Amino acid sequence: MKKTIIGVVIVAIVCWLGGSWVLAKQQPSQEKITIVGSTALQPLAEAVANDYRTKHPQTSIIVQGGGSGTGLSQVQAGAVNIGSADIFADQQDGINANKLDDNIVAVSGIVPIVNEELGIKNLTMKQLQQIFTGQITNWQEVGGPDLPITVINRAHGSGTRVAFEQTVLKPGMQAVNAQEQDSNGTVKEIIRNTPGAISYIAFAYLNDQVQSVSLDGVAPTADNITTNKWPLW
Protein backbone atom coordinates (compact mmCIF):
# COMPACT_ATOMS: atom_id res chain seq x y z
CA MET A 1 0.00 0.00 0.00
CA LYS A 2 2.75 2.44 0.90
CA LYS A 3 4.56 2.03 -2.41
CA THR A 4 1.34 2.33 -4.40
CA ILE A 5 0.31 5.61 -2.80
CA ILE A 6 3.72 7.20 -3.17
CA GLY A 7 3.78 6.14 -6.81
CA VAL A 8 0.53 8.00 -7.42
CA VAL A 9 1.91 11.08 -5.69
CA ILE A 10 5.06 11.14 -7.81
CA VAL A 11 3.01 10.91 -11.00
CA ALA A 12 0.76 13.72 -9.75
CA ILE A 13 3.63 16.15 -9.27
CA VAL A 14 4.31 16.28 -12.98
CA CYS A 15 1.24 18.52 -13.16
CA TRP A 16 1.91 20.38 -9.88
CA LEU A 17 4.28 22.85 -8.82
CA GLY A 18 9.87 21.51 -1.98
CA GLY A 19 7.64 19.34 -0.07
CA SER A 20 7.81 15.73 0.98
CA TRP A 21 5.77 12.88 2.33
CA VAL A 22 7.34 11.35 5.41
CA LEU A 23 6.41 7.78 6.28
CA ALA A 24 7.08 5.74 9.37
CA LYS A 25 9.15 2.70 8.44
CA GLN A 26 7.62 -0.78 8.38
CA GLN A 27 3.98 0.31 8.10
CA PRO A 28 1.64 -2.67 7.63
CA SER A 29 -0.80 -2.84 4.71
CA GLN A 30 -4.21 -1.49 5.69
CA GLU A 31 -7.51 -0.18 4.36
CA LYS A 32 -7.39 3.13 6.26
CA ILE A 33 -4.74 5.77 5.64
CA THR A 34 -4.31 9.05 7.51
CA ILE A 35 -2.25 11.93 6.09
CA VAL A 36 -1.50 14.90 8.36
CA GLY A 37 0.77 17.93 8.08
CA SER A 38 1.64 20.78 5.75
CA THR A 39 -1.29 22.87 4.56
CA ALA A 40 0.89 23.86 1.59
CA LEU A 41 0.77 20.24 0.45
CA GLN A 42 -2.83 19.61 1.50
CA PRO A 43 -4.40 20.38 -1.91
CA LEU A 44 -1.99 17.90 -3.51
CA ALA A 45 -2.70 15.28 -0.85
CA GLU A 46 -6.45 15.71 -1.30
CA ALA A 47 -6.22 15.45 -5.08
CA VAL A 48 -4.12 12.28 -4.87
CA ALA A 49 -6.42 10.80 -2.22
CA ASN A 50 -9.48 11.43 -4.40
CA ASP A 51 -7.80 9.82 -7.39
CA TYR A 52 -6.76 6.80 -5.33
CA ARG A 53 -10.26 6.36 -3.88
CA THR A 54 -11.78 6.11 -7.36
CA LYS A 55 -9.49 3.17 -8.12
CA HIS A 56 -9.60 1.61 -4.63
CA PRO A 57 -13.02 2.48 -3.15
CA GLN A 58 -12.49 0.07 -0.25
CA THR A 59 -9.73 2.31 1.10
CA SER A 60 -10.52 5.15 3.50
CA ILE A 61 -8.10 8.08 3.24
CA ILE A 62 -8.25 10.97 5.71
CA VAL A 63 -6.31 14.15 4.86
CA GLN A 64 -5.76 16.84 7.51
CA GLY A 65 -3.57 19.94 7.91
CA GLY A 66 -1.91 21.07 11.12
CA GLY A 67 1.46 22.16 9.76
CA SER A 68 4.73 20.48 8.86
CA GLY A 69 5.85 20.13 12.47
CA THR A 70 2.63 18.33 13.34
CA GLY A 71 2.97 16.02 10.36
CA LEU A 72 6.50 15.05 11.33
CA SER A 73 5.76 14.54 15.02
CA GLN A 74 2.56 12.58 14.34
CA VAL A 75 4.16 10.18 11.89
CA GLN A 76 7.15 9.69 14.20
CA ALA A 77 4.76 8.82 17.04
CA GLY A 78 2.97 6.31 14.82
CA ALA A 79 -0.31 8.21 15.12
CA VAL A 80 -0.65 8.64 11.33
CA ASN A 81 0.55 6.79 8.26
CA ILE A 82 1.89 9.72 6.26
CA GLY A 83 3.17 13.09 7.44
CA SER A 84 3.38 15.85 4.85
CA ALA A 85 5.98 18.58 5.31
CA ASP A 86 7.66 21.30 3.29
CA ILE A 87 10.83 20.81 5.30
CA PHE A 88 12.97 17.69 5.61
CA ALA A 89 12.67 15.56 8.74
CA ASP A 90 16.20 16.45 9.87
CA GLN A 91 15.30 20.17 9.86
CA GLN A 92 12.70 19.78 12.62
CA ASP A 93 13.72 19.78 16.29
CA GLY A 94 12.68 16.67 18.18
CA ILE A 95 12.45 14.49 15.09
CA ASN A 96 14.67 11.45 14.57
CA ALA A 97 15.08 11.47 10.80
CA ASN A 98 16.68 8.01 10.89
CA LYS A 99 13.31 6.53 11.83
CA LEU A 100 11.45 8.12 8.93
CA ASP A 101 11.48 7.82 5.15
CA ASP A 102 11.64 11.16 3.30
CA ASN A 103 9.98 11.10 -0.12
CA ILE A 104 10.27 14.30 -2.17
CA VAL A 105 7.08 14.84 -4.18
CA ALA A 106 6.77 18.51 -5.09
CA VAL A 107 8.18 22.02 -5.17
CA SER A 108 5.81 24.52 -3.57
CA GLY A 109 6.17 28.18 -4.48
CA ILE A 110 5.66 30.75 -1.71
CA VAL A 111 3.86 33.97 -2.62
CA PRO A 112 3.73 37.25 -0.65
CA ILE A 113 0.14 38.53 -0.54
CA VAL A 114 -1.51 41.81 0.47
CA ASN A 115 -5.04 43.14 0.73
CA GLU A 116 -6.21 43.74 -2.84
CA GLU A 117 -7.30 47.33 -2.10
CA LEU A 118 -3.79 48.32 -1.01
CA GLY A 119 -2.50 48.97 -4.53
CA ILE A 120 0.90 47.33 -3.96
CA LYS A 121 1.80 44.83 -6.69
CA ASN A 122 5.60 44.74 -6.55
CA LEU A 123 8.30 44.91 -3.88
CA THR A 124 12.03 44.40 -3.94
CA MET A 125 13.41 41.50 -1.93
CA LYS A 126 15.12 44.08 0.29
CA GLN A 127 11.81 45.83 0.98
CA LEU A 128 10.16 42.49 1.81
CA GLN A 129 12.99 41.74 4.21
CA GLN A 130 12.65 45.15 5.86
CA ILE A 131 8.89 44.73 6.26
CA PHE A 132 9.20 41.33 7.93
CA THR A 133 11.96 42.54 10.26
CA GLY A 134 10.04 45.67 11.28
CA GLN A 135 12.34 48.20 9.59
CA ILE A 136 9.54 49.37 7.29
CA THR A 137 6.25 49.92 9.11
CA ASN A 138 4.13 52.06 6.79
CA TRP A 139 3.12 51.37 3.20
CA GLN A 140 3.96 54.96 2.28
CA GLU A 141 7.63 54.00 2.60
CA VAL A 142 7.33 51.67 -0.41
CA GLY A 143 5.06 53.78 -2.61
CA GLY A 144 1.72 52.85 -1.10
CA PRO A 145 -0.87 54.77 0.94
CA ASP A 146 -0.22 56.25 4.38
CA LEU A 147 -1.28 53.09 6.20
CA PRO A 148 0.42 51.05 8.92
CA ILE A 149 1.72 47.65 7.82
CA THR A 150 0.13 44.67 9.56
CA VAL A 151 2.40 41.63 9.28
CA ILE A 152 0.75 38.22 9.53
CA ASN A 153 3.35 35.47 9.98
CA ARG A 154 3.07 31.72 9.90
CA ALA A 155 3.32 29.82 13.16
CA HIS A 156 6.51 28.23 14.42
CA GLY A 157 6.53 24.67 13.09
CA SER A 158 5.33 25.82 9.68
CA GLY A 159 7.58 24.54 6.93
CA THR A 160 6.46 27.44 4.75
CA ARG A 161 7.76 29.86 7.40
CA VAL A 162 11.10 28.05 7.56
CA ALA A 163 11.51 28.25 3.77
CA PHE A 164 10.37 31.90 3.66
CA GLU A 165 12.75 33.05 6.40
CA GLN A 166 15.70 31.09 4.98
CA THR A 167 15.27 32.96 1.69
CA VAL A 168 14.16 36.42 2.80
CA LEU A 169 16.00 36.96 6.09
CA LYS A 170 19.76 37.04 6.48
CA PRO A 171 21.48 34.93 9.18
CA GLY A 172 20.91 36.46 12.60
CA MET A 173 17.85 38.44 11.56
CA GLN A 174 14.67 38.02 13.58
CA ALA A 175 11.16 38.35 12.21
CA VAL A 176 9.10 41.18 13.68
CA ASN A 177 6.66 40.23 16.44
CA ALA A 178 3.37 39.62 14.68
CA GLN A 179 0.16 37.67 14.72
CA GLU A 180 0.86 34.05 13.75
CA GLN A 181 -1.43 31.63 11.95
CA ASP A 182 -0.93 27.96 11.21
CA SER A 183 -2.75 27.52 7.90
CA ASN A 184 -2.66 29.01 4.42
CA GLY A 185 -6.45 29.32 4.30
CA THR A 186 -6.66 31.30 7.55
CA VAL A 187 -3.84 33.61 6.47
CA LYS A 188 -5.55 34.33 3.16
CA GLU A 189 -8.85 35.14 4.89
CA ILE A 190 -7.16 37.56 7.31
CA ILE A 191 -5.36 39.35 4.48
CA ARG A 192 -8.59 39.61 2.50
CA ASN A 193 -10.33 41.34 5.41
CA THR A 194 -7.48 43.46 6.81
CA PRO A 195 -6.44 46.71 5.06
CA GLY A 196 -2.67 47.11 5.20
CA ALA A 197 -1.99 43.44 5.88
CA ILE A 198 0.80 41.37 4.33
CA SER A 199 1.72 37.71 4.63
CA TYR A 200 2.68 34.78 2.41
CA ILE A 201 0.98 31.57 1.30
CA ALA A 202 1.68 28.49 -0.77
CA PHE A 203 1.18 28.99 -4.51
CA ALA A 204 -1.65 26.42 -4.59
CA TYR A 205 -3.82 28.70 -2.42
CA LEU A 206 -3.43 31.83 -4.55
CA ASN A 207 -6.64 33.24 -6.05
CA ASP A 208 -8.25 36.59 -6.86
CA GLN A 209 -9.39 37.20 -3.27
CA VAL A 210 -5.97 38.64 -2.44
CA GLN A 211 -3.25 40.51 -4.34
CA SER A 212 -0.09 38.59 -5.08
CA VAL A 213 3.13 40.59 -4.89
CA SER A 214 5.85 40.36 -7.53
CA LEU A 215 9.46 40.50 -6.33
CA ASP A 216 11.98 42.65 -8.20
CA GLY A 217 9.61 42.64 -11.17
CA VAL A 218 9.25 38.84 -11.31
CA ALA A 219 5.67 37.60 -11.03
CA PRO A 220 4.75 34.49 -8.99
CA THR A 221 3.65 32.23 -11.84
CA ALA A 222 3.92 28.49 -12.38
CA ASP A 223 6.38 29.05 -15.23
CA ASN A 224 8.62 31.31 -13.14
CA ILE A 225 8.62 28.82 -10.27
CA THR A 226 9.52 25.83 -12.43
CA THR A 227 12.28 27.75 -14.25
CA ASN A 228 13.70 29.04 -10.94
CA LYS A 229 13.13 32.70 -11.82
CA TRP A 230 10.89 33.02 -8.77
CA PRO A 231 13.08 33.13 -5.62
CA LEU A 232 10.63 31.83 -3.00
CA TRP A 233 10.12 28.07 -2.95
Q: Which functions belong to the PLM regions below?
A:
Residues 2-233:
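Exported/periplasmic ABC-transporter solute-binding proteins
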